[in-house]
């Protein structure tokens, strides 16, 4: 079964939480509380998302995290790449020449074509697109917090 990892799903939830108030700085602990994702997992994912250029961070007592780009400019492919590595269905779709079966394989090129089509579809799907469908179902803790008047850390 093809499926993204739970960590990629969590990373997407965190990015959606950051996009709720894009100008604000969000603490890792605050994001953990609001999303229901464990604090250690949130910290790990924020580091990976920062390394990939999807979030920016500000250090210090008034620091925190925010999206590095608008949600419409962050693709699903970039999110998956940040957490799981390159999108590909088979090893040869990423690293041609590293498979012992390659000399006799009759399907490698077809899988590469499928991987390219999948990657293209994911590149055409933005974080904004992912958040466009009923956010209450996908991130109930975040929505409840926003509805209750929660305000993240803001720059002073």
Model-predicted regions and their roles:
Residues 71-96, 107-117:
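Conserved segment of winged-helix/HTH DNA-binding domains
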Residues 26-36:
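A short alpha-helical element within helix-turn-helix/winged-helix DNA-binding domains
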């Amino acid at each position: 079964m093809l499926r993204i990892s739970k960590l990629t799903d969590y990373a997407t939830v965190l990015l959606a939480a950051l996009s709720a108030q894009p100008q604000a700085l969000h603490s890792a602990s605050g994001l953990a509380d609001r999303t229901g994702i464990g604090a250690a997992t949130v910290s790990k994912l924020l580091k990976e998302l920062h390394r990939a250029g999807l979030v920016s961070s500000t250090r210090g007592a008034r620091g925190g995290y925010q999206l590095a780009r608008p949600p419409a400019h962050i693709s699903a492919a970039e999110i998956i790449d940040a957490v799981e590595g390159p999108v590909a269905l088979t090893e040869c779709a990423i690293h041609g020449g590293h498979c012992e079966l390659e000399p006799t394989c009759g399907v490698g090129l077809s899988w590469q074509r499928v991987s390219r089509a999948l990657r293209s579809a994911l590149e055409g799907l933005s974080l904004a697109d992912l958040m466009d469908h009923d956010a209450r179902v996908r991130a109930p803790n975040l929505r409840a917090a926003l509805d209750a008047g929660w305000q993240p850390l803001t720059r002073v």
